[in-house]
Amino acid sequence: MRIALLAGDGIGPEITAEAVKILKAVVGQEIEFDEALIGGAAWKVTGSPLPEETLKLCKNSDAILFGSVGDPECDHLERALRPEQAILGLRKELDLFANLRPARLFPELQAESPLKENIVTGTDLMIVRELTGDVYFGTPRGQRKDDQNRREGFDTMRYNEDEVKRIARIGFETARSRSGNLCSIDKSNVLETSQLWRTVVLEIAQEYPDVELSHMYVDNAAMQLVRAPDQFDVIVTGNLFGDILSDLASACVGSIGLLPSASLNSEGKGLYEPIHGSAPDIAGLGKANPLATILSGAMMLRYSLKREADADRIEKAVSTALEKGARTADLGGKMTTSEMGNAVLAALN
């Protein structure tokens, strides 16, 4: 198993180092990591946030473990050269159209949630977000002057039926592997794009008679996520709505330092990363929480490498470490990044 290791910027090298430590402890010599530059670190050396060498490595690897991108020293660059463009480029080049973001409340961390205990207890959901279409990629887009010489910005929200079909199937398959309940979230009372979305999802539902499908408007879904998050198991939605709702769900369960993600293509190749950013303000200080990256490694084992038992083992070790009181600063503790990794390592054994 060959893994492309893209540590990136900010806290990326620190948190990926802990994930690699755990993965090697679980899998041993069967897994090998090939490092490459990406983001601001790559731009400083090559002049590109996504060098051809890095892209080639990713295409030839079994999976990608990604740290973070984002560097204030690159804020002056034009959009195409900014570190954040690297992740967009990888999604496009590898056709990583399906983003899976679990949001699970660890019982040991109920006090970290901003929601009341009786509301948030039992929250364990998965958001399946379409990642390569919608308003983020639709054209035309830009800025111009209107007929009265006023500045205006414009974007295009667009989906075709094939894009909706393939993400819907991922949603149904994910629901089938869990509780059998899927909620499709759209804005079909207003948007033509969402009307197509709902129509196609209903068509695909005929292929999954064992999965119970419901629909919800995105504004109501946002309210329901903070009112009664335990009503959801699997959510499938578009790029824009998924971007917003997944961040909201992450806040419901506590620190974003706990939440992993997977971005998959139709062949099962995936990019695995924590949902948080590069946090340049604490880079190199040993304050970052590595658990989201460690859990991203577990998702990599499950979805791309088909090692379910190993993934379960890592997730159980994280839970055990938290149960024994392991806490980094974001969780109200004093552990360093490496100490948290060592706590998970000890729990493995």
Curated annotation (Swiss-Prot):
It comes from the Bacteria. Pathway: Amino-acid biosynthesis; L-leucine biosynthesis; L-leucine from 3-methyl-2-oxobutanoate: step 3/4. Substrate binds at residues 91, 101, 129, 219. One of its GO terms (biological process) is L-leucine biosynthetic process. The record marks 136, 187 as: Important for catalysis. NAD(+) binds at residues 277-289. It comes from Zymomonas mobilis subsp. mobilis (strain ATCC 31821 / ZM4 / CP4). This is 3-isopropylmalate dehydrogenase. Its EC number is 1.1.1.85. PROSITE patterns: IDH_IMDH. Catalyzes the oxidation of 3-carboxy-2-hydroxy-4-methylpentanoate (3-isopropylmalate) to 3-carboxy-4-methyl-2-oxopentanoate. The product decarboxylates to 4-methyl-2 oxopentanoate. It is found in: Cytoplasm. The lineage of its organism: Bacteria, Pseudomonadati, Pseudomonadota, Alphaproteobacteria, Sphingomonadales. InterPro entries: IsoCit/isopropylmalate_DH_CS, IsoPropMal-DH-like_dom, Isopropylmalate_DH. Belongs to the isocitrate and isopropylmalate dehydrogenases family. LeuB type 1 subfamily. Keywords: Amino-acid biosynthesis, Branched-chain amino acid biosynthesis, Cytoplasm, Leucine biosynthesis, Magnesium, Manganese, Metal-binding, NAD, Oxidoreductase. Mg(2+) binds at residues 219, 243, 247. Its cofactor is Mg(2+); Mn(2+). Homodimer. GO terms for molecular function: 3-isopropylmalate dehydrogenase activity; magnesium ion binding; NAD binding. Binds 1 Mg(2+) or Mn(2+) ion per subunit. It catalyses: (2R,3S)-3-isopropylmalate + NAD(+) = 4-methyl-2-oxopentanoate + CO2 + NADH. The keyword NAD applies. GO terms for cellular component: cytosol. It is an enzyme of class 1 (oxidoreductase).
